[in-house]
Amino acid sequence: MKNDVISPEFDENGRPLRRIRSFVRRQGRLTKGQEHALENYWPVMGVEFSEDMLDFPALFGREAPVTLEIGFGMGASLVAMAKDRPEQDFLGIEVHSPGVGACLSSAHEEGLSNLRVMCHDAVEVLHKMIPDNSLRMVQLFFPDPWHKARHNKRRIVQVPFAELVKSKLQLGGIFHMATDWEPYAEHMLEVMSSIDGYKNLSESNDYVPRPASRPVTKFEQRGHRLGHGVWDLMFERVK
């Protein structure tokens, strides 16, 4: 499952342009279970888009570190992380409603109270709803690599986007990316290394081993069986 959730084009003031998206809305058919989850669990765990900044302590009912995941696919790894780290809070963004329904269903099954989800364009959410200096971590796992050269501008990891993420991270917060497409990994590394205020957490100044905190997805397991590599990058906001 590829996640592909945001439109990375910005104007000169850093505001998102709406002309080019890095995702295509492929809503697909909802299963009965996904439809049931959207109808019954969205009122509890769903967050509607608005132009008001989120108050995380009010949203989750407590003070706790917040992780934002952009493009959670069907939500399996996001639910696993929220289950494994009950002391932290998680907000996931995904534009495809079947994935949102699947995530809500799994989260309900696990009885999670530390997970909220949104179904909206992530750049708009970052600009309009995420307070500056509020996130402990931002996760972007397996975004669409847009293989063809003429589509490279659609890749979400571009300098303006990485700068936007940095502004939302707390000092010491982490931007964690993963991809199975080596040219995209190289692109991510080039973009992130060019930005003042980020520190690469790799000892070799490139990629990090997969941290135990990131579950291995079915998509990734299949890739390993086929001999595909996976590259993790972790950058800390240091100023």
Swiss-Prot record:
Q: Which residues bind S-adenosyl-L-methionine?
A: E69, E94, D121, D144
Tell me any Pfam family this protein matches: Methyltransf_4
Q: Which InterPro entries match?
A: SAM-dependent_MTases_sf, tRNA_(Gua-N-7)_MeTrfase_Trmb, tRNA_methyltr_TrmB_bact
The cellular component terms of Gene Ontology attached to this UniProt record, alphabetical and capped at eight, are: tRNA methyltransferase complex
What pathway is it annotated to?
Answer: tRNA modification; N(7)-methylguanine-tRNA biosynthesis
Q: Which Gene3D superfamilies match?
A: Vaccinia Virus protein VP39 (3.40.50.150)
Q: Where is the active site?
A: D144
Detail which positions bind substrate: K148, D180, T217, K218, F219, E220
Chemical reaction(s) catalysed:
guanosine(46) in tRNA + S-adenosyl-L-methionine = N(7)-methylguanosine(46) in tRNA + S-adenosyl-L-homocysteine
Quote the function comment for this protein: Catalyzes the formation of N(7)-methylguanine at position 46 (m7G46) in tRNA.
Q: Quaternary form?
A: Monomer.
Name the record gives this protein:
tRNA (guanine-N(7)-)-methyltransferase
Q: What is the lineage of its organism?
A: Bacteria, Pseudomonadati, Pseudomonadota, Gammaproteobacteria, Enterobacterales
Q: Give the encoding gene's name.
A: trmB
